Amino acid sequence: MSETVQDKVDFLVVANRLPVDRKVDDDGNVSWKSSPGGLVTALEPVMQRKGGAWIGWHGAPDEVVAPFHHDGYDIHPVPLSAQEVEEYYEGFANATLWPLYHDCIVEPVFHREWWDAYQKVNKRFAEQAAEQASTGATVWVQDYQLNLVPKYLREMRPDLRIGFFLHIPFPPIELYSRLPWREELVEGLLGADLVGFQTPGAAANFQRLAKHRPGVTAARGRARTPDGRTVVIHDFPISIDSRGFHELATSEKVQAEAAK
């Protein structure tokens, strides 16, 4: 596979963080290594098999990093300022949405400036995806930090197939109604063609919210939007890479070790 970053790709993952961490050796040489964590563990085998591009923040504020190729796919870092990290990520994503979605003992905090930063950053991620996607490409948006990206991306590139997956719980309407910007977030997710959740209960909670939107009908895992699109709402519990583990377990090396 080519080591050159492609102009356009047919498959993109859009996530808050990139799947790599930067390493600098004693001589100052920079390399990128796969990050630990559930999201990378779940998606990296897909990226290695399909190729394409991963769009996300590289972890350091106030810095622009050029795109590069890594382990069979392209990496497109999205720059964030220190203030955006504080307001969009540490603020709205992790101090507003995270405790609300998990129904934590810690109360969610609501600040207008956090919400403004969340919108601004989500639009930047959507713009990057719109720029890198080929005609009719599939874009897979990940998790609660990027709830608005599907709608923004739909407005920019209606030709794309857009999926969204939430890796954390989705609360019932009684909890979600506490959020001042709940309508905007639901509309953001309805920009996708498919909205996926970890559990049937989370999918049912979102469907119930969706059908309260003006002009939206929702039932039996489908939502019909005012512009005539059908959005699939379903649960897709993430599993391990069973095929990869089977191949490893049946490899000659492992079988030889097991026979000792």
Show where each model-derived region lies:
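Catalytic cores of carbohydrate-active enzymes across secretory and cytosolic contexts
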Residues: M1-K260
